[in-house]
Amino acid sequence: MSSVAASQNKINDLLEAIRQEFANVSQEANSYRLQNQKDYDFKINQQLAEMQQVRNTVYELELTHRKMKDAYEEEISRLKLELEQKDRQLASIAHGSTVGNVPGQVPQLSRNSGAQGNANIAPPNIPQPMVSQTVGTGMAPQMAPLNTQHPTQQTKSNAGEQAAANLAPVIQQQQQPQQQLPPQQQQQQQQQQQSNIPVTTAAPVQPAGGNLDQTVPNSISPQQQPTEQQQPASTATTAPATASTAPPTSAPSDQVGQDHYLVPADQRAVHAKPIPPFLLDLDSQLVPSHLKKQNNDYYVLHNPALPTDLDVELHKSLEHSSVVCCVRFSSDGEFLATGCNKTTQVYKVSTGELVARLSDDSASQPQPQPQNQTVTAETSTSNSNGSSAEDGTGNQNSAASTASSDLYIRSVCFSPDGKFLATGAEDKLIRIWDLETKKIVMTLKGHEQDIYSLDYFPSGNKLVSGSGDRTVRIWDLTTGTCSLTLSIEDGVTTVAVSPGEGKFIAAGSLDRTVRVWDSDTGFLVERLDSENELGTGHRDSVYSVVFTRDGKGVVSGSLDRSVKLWNLNGLSGQKSHAECEVTYTGHKDFVLSVATTQNDEYILSGSKDRGVLFWDTKSGNPLLMLQGHRNSVISVTVANGHPLGPEYGVFATGSGDCKARIWKYSKKNSQQNSTQIKEIKE
């Protein structure tokens, strides 16, 4: 028995030793696993940090490359301009020495020579100072910010600079045909032009090195108004006004004199084009009565080269307590929403009646959020969250907001059924309002900076948003969660959803690029930027994008003062990639908003220059300019349907002058004028 007991004890000891060894091995394995996991996580995080660093380095290199490219392009343009000036000066000197021996002109020049020395070579040197005047000061009237004075006062104050700057196109136009002729014909034409130059009697002709500021304007006859402006890319968009020096009745009457008011067919996509002269002169007093419509509160200037078949009229002016940052119509066009400081207003379009004023009293000063904040949504079935609303009579349903800080509503958007209104603000929140109860039913959180743009999907169950945090987010409104996040290199300023099924979303950003994604997969399908092969992209930040009504194109507006129409034929397989079809040049300051009419016949654009331009979509010609605000036109929107009757189209504008305005437009003699426009275009 003792041997059996001893064997049993020995077995137990061995089992205990095995158990202990197993426990030690398990503990060691767990320790190794934890250590390996830590090492693995550390290496992963380190590699992610390195990748992010590489990414940032690439972005910085790209930005540096763009800046260097812009600098080189500007330098090249400047050098080209200097070479052209030198060539013209040399040609003029050579021509002057030849023409100076002509017997018929010697007595005429000798009368003005006096103590001026060899004055017979002075007239050929006149173009050089005039061209330099255009480069030096001709840019100033358009680059400077608009002040609060009336446009007529600005024109009068800048008359001195414009008078000298207006002469450059004349010289260019006279000299360009000579470069295309054989030498003998050039000499004959030069002699003919020299004999046609009137000799001034108001002041003696100065030597080549003298001051010509006072003598040059007197040596150009009034009939030598420019008929076409051709300048290098660096100065093409800053051509000075010419209409200010012309008499009120000197509007062009024939097609030859009106060519510079129209865009040639082969230059529609070109970025650098001169601004049509009628857009440069904001003094409506100098415009013939048949080319303008003027009231105490606004005026309209028509393109002299096109029939005045469009009529624009102010319907309602809606006063606000602060800057109007955004305006948006409902899908049926019956209501208009406006966003300003802390409040969103909804108006009845037909009457201008205030239907609701929405504000969230719980909103406070925007606070920074953690980098890894979870994207969530808050819902509310009552008004206990501090939101307030007013009915059409202006009576508040709850206490007024006590917040002292500004909180501008940057974007508003109606749901397709018109029952809800989405608002985006500086506090990084998206609020969904029930317009019947005037309460917040959902709050979408996740953006880390100001929200600048919103757009509903046609189905109404999704919403896209763009923010300064460099992301575009798609929200599922059935669950209140973010279903897709798209990140780019710079802040997002504007977003839009394609019509129909909402298959694509477009976004504009501070990096001068328009991107188009597939809304289902998040794949980037088009990138429309200034680095394309043709160089037809935007040269500055893109502040507004909108799809055309047929969904086949995108319209964009930029701080480079241009509007562009991009076709999306590449998405349908017709072409390998999208391209710029038309560049609309006419604004004198930043383009802040763009919109299209229902049939895509017209494009509307609002600008910091306080104007709204109507563009013919296909030709790129500006049809008219509306000046109806005393500050920047921040937002433009066009209504669907005909809320003011079948004969009127309706659009609205929001401005920094604390006003939102509803306008109506109509066409007069549509069939007759459309035929005339077609003939002019052809």
Swiss-Prot record:
Gene3D superfamilies xref list: 1.20.5.340, YVTN repeat-like/Quinoprotein amine dehydrogenase
SMART domains: WD40
Each WD repeat, start to end: 319-359, 404-443, 446-485, 487-527, 537-576, 586-625, 628-673
Region forming the signal peptide: none
Extent of Low complexity compositional bias: 114-123, 172-194, 221-255
A Pfam family recorded for this sequence: Tup_N
Keywords on record: Repeat, Repressor, Transcription, Transcription regulation, WD repeat
Compositionally biased region (Polar residues): 145-160, 374-400
Task performed by this protein: Represses transcription by RNA polymerase II.
Name of this protein: General transcriptional corepressor TUP1
Species whose genome carries this gene: Kluyveromyces lactis (strain ATCC 8585 / CBS 2359 / DSM 70799 / NBRC 1267 / NRRL Y-1140 / WM37)
